[in-house]
A protein has these predicted regions:
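Predominantly flavin-linked oxidoreductase catalytic cores and closely associated redox partners
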Residues: 1-98, 147
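Tryptophan-centered motif/residue detector
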Residues: 14, 61-63, 109, 118, ...
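Generic preference for well-ordered secondary structure
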Residues: 19, 23, 48, 75, ...
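Glycine-centered secondary-structure boundary/capping sites
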Residues: 19-21, 126, 130, 277, ...
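FAD/FMN-dependent oxidoreductases across multiple families
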Residues: 68, 77-189
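Generic secondary-structure boundary signal with a strong preference for alpha-helix termini
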Residues: 72, 139, 257-259
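Long, low-complexity C-terminal extensions of enzymes
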Residues: 152-304
Length: 304
């Protein structure tokens, strides 16, 4: 019997034909539209950002990714809180003068996933399996995870059913946990200026599992006990980065008496900052590193 892997992006051809239902997450993640543009650098030596810049907007957010010759920029938004024309104006406003003539592409998507990804001799991988939104590159992570699990669970002896049950249970739990992580970026925001942000912070839009974790973290930081290393694609450090990067306050006053290493911690943080300043002053710029990689076959094929 032949095996099939459904990785088709737009039509998701196999799953609908097999009547595998799609579980929508629109009640949790409101964004369902995107507008993308490519913006060439004004100068060939213009700096390349070494990270993706994500900027919150009235009804969504904008991504800004620096590449070697251009920036990839897009606006992700909710059609329940904005419309295509308004969202495009927001994007062009972010682009500035260069955005007046920039070509843009509009996309529609729905946040969600399939609760059954392995059915008989077919497996859904990548966007045919599920998609939340461009935030945190969960699509790439899930494609890699799926490929690894298929390799480990491949039914060489014909044990399709047992392999499928394990694969589906694992993927379902991964999607549920990743959904919580993406929602975290919205639900702890301090913004209340638009309906989009007010709806996002309302408890009714937050999964019970995430509310439970937030209750824990009011009095202690996330730790390894909150994370399942066999399931979660984001570590406790990732949760901490988002929580405290967005200003979350963990009240440690009740255990102040046992926190005896405050001075040591301050010295350690000061040393980290010193090393960061040294690195900034002495390491090559991101553009220089990219140019070196292209000319010296650093991590890949040399430029032609």
């Amino acid at each position: 019997m032949a095996e099939r892997v459904d990785s088709l992006v737009r039509r998701r051809s196999l799953a609908p034909a097999m009547r595998i239902p799609f579980s929508s997450c629109r009640d949790v993640l409101f964004c369902n539209r995107a507008i993308a543009a490519q913006l060439p650098y004004a100068r060939p030596d213009e700096p390349i950002a070494s990270y993706t810049i994500s900027t919150a907007q009235e009804a969504g957010w904008i991504w800004d990714i620096g590449l070697d010759r251009r920036r990839g920029i897009g606006h992700v938004y909710s059609s329940d809180h904005s419309d295509d024309e308004a969202a495009e104006r927001v994007l062009r406003g972010y682009l500035g003068a260069a955005g007046e003539k920039a070509d843009v592409r509009h996309f529609k998507f729905e946040a969600g996933y399939r609760e059954v990804n392995w059915y008989k001799n077919c497996v859904a991988v990548g966007l045919s399996s599920g998609f939340f939104e461009p935030l945190e590159a969960t699509g790439i992570a899930f494609a890699e995870v799926s490929a690894g699990m298929i390799a480990n669970l491949f039914p060489w002896g014909g044990d399709y059913e047992t392999s499928a049950r394990q694969f589906n249970a694992n993927m379902l739990r991964r999607y549920e946990r990743a959904l919580d992580f993406i929602k975290l970026h919205y639900c702890i925001s301090e913004r209340r200026d638009t309906a989009f942000w007010r709806d996002n912070v309302a408890d009714a839009s937050v999964p019970d599992s995430l509310l439970e974790m937030l209750d824990r973290w009011r009095f202690r930081p996330p730790n390894e006990l909150d994370i399942d290393g066999q399931i979660d694609i984001f570590t406790e450090a990732s949760w901490q980065y988002v929580l405290y990067g967005m200003g979350w306050k963990t009240d440690l006053s009740a255990k102040a008496g046992v926190l005896r290493y405050g001075d040591d911690a301050r010295r350690a943080f000061a040393e980290v900052q010193r090393q960061a300043r040294y690195a900034i002053a002495n390491l090559p710029s991101n553009r220089d590193l990219v140019a070196y990689a292209q000319s010296h076959s650093f991590g890949g094929r040399a430029a032609a």
